[in-house]
């Protein structure tokens, strides 16, 4: 029996990965409520196995004809599968770094895993949402769980402050996005499916432009694009490090999935307008994120501005609007997951050992912890785009796609800001590898030996090794990964590329077919 076969009119097989995550969430919740202390120690393993199970179902789903569920509200096309995989993989690595972190912080872990799985579920549904209601519910599920995670360490005033700032800015951006969706609902005469709205916007005039602006504002918040980035540095600095790791990749991946589907499906008639707006946002984001990062003295805050700058690079692929542009965007998010989460795993370990994330306190770390120094150095250099690491090939594909699409200004700004980013990444690496004992910081001088057998430490080490290996070998294997991304773009009809129309004949739903007919023009052609 094929477990992915359509179930009734809802085609429930399309959401099997989400079902696995939901069941895991319920099991974790029940064990945390009724289990003893011994049972609660199994919560990280239960969460991790559930997330790995969801990844397996996503791999199996890749081999099946694409389906829609909830009567056309959710699409399980290849692009959706890849983005959902990114969200799940981010959550799995977050679990690995969270166990030891919250044990040492004295915070209960059960509720955190429930919130993390809830946010993961929201991100997964957001990646495949094809209906206004599904988009909003998924966005709120992801957002509310993220606000609660940001303030999870209640005893830390910085965490409470971060949660409040995140809540206020998030609520404002949600209101703006909701107003844009209400305009779309009115302009289309009450349509909620994204593909059904597009034909009504061809002659919408100023109101249509207004709807686009409001929707871009809401999406820009999720991407931490300038000028919607103000929440990012403070939230990243004050929130627990595992939460920051999830927000920097998982939430951002879901945001880019929403951006691609929403803009390509709803606004094909305004392609030039949203590309022009996003071009300006991309330039501002790359410049501000990378320039301001130079002045940072705390590594978490530096990574916050780095995350803003990285979003600007990824926007190049979205602005290009070509097959290569979308494929390079997805590929870069794949490698960004490995190198950025690897950096946060290292920051987590160092803060557990020293209680600080001041960059100066990393001075001389190589002499006390060569493994941590190696992992953090590789991840930072990859974020800077140095060959032959994964980040270099990710930026190479993005810049090449932008150049082919005629986005010369974006590519040149990207190249200049990439050079700037190398400076502040190398500065951290140089601080860690100083050879003179007298230059060793006080925190490193008192650096305790690492007990890898302590509770939560084996998972942390596995996460560091996995991200280190992925960061190194994703560069070597960049061609197969980019081919996978290209295949996903080609086989997702809502993007409207010619090969997508021939994919899985008879399996594409009417709403996807409508979206495919409103194809984006390729600038490179």
Curated annotation (Swiss-Prot):
Subcellular location: Cellular thylakoid membrane
PANTHER family: NADH DEHYDROGENASE (PTHR22773)
Main location: membrane
Catalytic activity: a plastoquinone + NADH + (n+1) H(+)(in) = a plastoquinol + NAD(+) + n H(+)(out); a plastoquinone + NADPH + (n+1) H(+)(in) = a plastoquinol + NADP(+) + n H(+)(out)
Origin species: Synechococcus sp. (strain JA-3-3Ab)
Superkingdom of this protein's organism: Bacteria
Keyword terms, alphabetized: Membrane, NAD, NADP, Plastoquinone, Quinone, Thylakoid, Translocase, Transmembrane, Transmembrane helix, Transport
GO MF assignments: NADH dehydrogenase (ubiquinone) activity; quinone binding
GO cellular component terms attached to this protein's record: plasma membrane-derived thylakoid membrane
Entry keyword annotation includes Nuclease: no
Entry EC no(s): 7.1.1.-
Name of the protein in its database record: NAD(P)H-quinone oxidoreductase subunit 2
Database matches in InterPro entries: NADH-Q_OxRdtase_suN/2 (IPR010096), ND/Mrp_TM (IPR001750)
Protein family: Belongs to the complex I subunit 2 family.
Primary role: NDH-1 shuttles electrons from an unknown electron donor, via FMN and iron-sulfur (Fe-S) centers, to quinones in the respiratory and/or the photosynthetic chain. The immediate electron acceptor for the enzyme in this species is believed to be plastoquinone. Couples the redox reaction to proton translocation, and thus conserves the redox energy in a proton gradient. Cyanobacterial NDH-1 also plays a role in inorganic carbon-concentration.
Membrane topology: Multi-pass membrane protein
Signal peptide: none
Gene Ontology biological process terms in this record: ATP synthesis coupled electron transport; photosynthesis, light reaction
